Structure formats: structure tokens, C-alpha cells
Amino acid sequence: MQLLTEKIKKALPPLYSSEDIPCEDKQVIVKFFNPLGSQTWEIVEGSEQLDGDWILFGFCDLGMGMPEWGYVTLRQLEEIKLPMGMGIERDICVN
């Protein structure tokens, strides 16, 4: 599954553009999840880097009981290899 479509890339506000907006008012643009676990990444901002990778900012819950706002790169999400040949998925009901 393509995690970032062209439509999503265009919809993502640049990094730091919503830093004056309270966390509870930020709009989730795309949500990623582990289909075999409880990890989720609710992304609100992102910027493409010179190497073609994306730095994404959002609410990250790694399933350890301590969700937090933070950064993840698209490459990091794409490199997560799960059993049965699966990987991180994009929630098609968001955006």
C-alpha cells in the first residue's frame, strides 16, 4: 500500500505550521496503523526533505501506554516489516 498519495502530500500542512493551534484542535490528515498490533500514527503535518523522504509530525501511540506528539519519517514507517509479509497500513477512512 502506498502510504503517502499525491492527494495526501498536497493536503499535509508544512512542519511547524500548526504549532500555535492547541493539540486538541489539530486536524489529522492521515492515519497509519500496524494491522497486527496497536501502534498508530495520526499525522497532522509533514514536509518533504531533499533526499525525497518525508518528516511527519503527529500523535504517535506505539502501544506502550504512553502516546505522545512526535516525529516519524515516511522511510521509518515503510521499513517496518511485520509477520506474513505485512507492513504499516494507511487508514483509508481518514482523509
Q: Model segments located where?
A:
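Catalytic phosphate/metal-binding cores of nucleic-acid and nucleotide-processing enzymes, i.e., regions
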Residues: 1-95
